[in-house]
């Protein structure tokens, strides 16, 4: 399923992935391309990413979020998704989130 998040340009926006089971690692994908700067190293919430562009947050054992600090028009219609390595079993994928930038068509 795909959710849509709308944000104004030059603001911060939080995109939240809900995963249906506990994980030990999360990778973020933008437009189906893995961004290595957004990989969570473990499921203990110890290695959250923080940079000038993104702030990745482990909220609970099944919810993970990324904050894009400064939304730009280049991010309009981008598709975001978490792919997680669960505690047991095969990889799981979260909901997909399409980012809409307000005022840009």
Show which residues each predicted segment covers:
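N-terminal V-set
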Residues: 19-53
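Structural signature of extracellular immunoglobulin-like
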Residues: 12-21, 27-33, 76-87, 97
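Extracellular beta-strand/loop-rich beta-sandwich domains predominantly from IgSF
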Residues: 5-6, 43-90
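Intrinsic-disorder/low-complexity, polar/charged segments enriched in Ser/Thr/Lys/Arg/Asp/Glu/Gln
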Residues: 12-14, 63-65, 92-96
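Short beta-strand segments of immunoglobulin-like
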Residues: 2-8, 12-14
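Flexible inter-domain hinge/linker segments at boundaries of tandem extracellular adhesion modules
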Residues: 1, 96-105
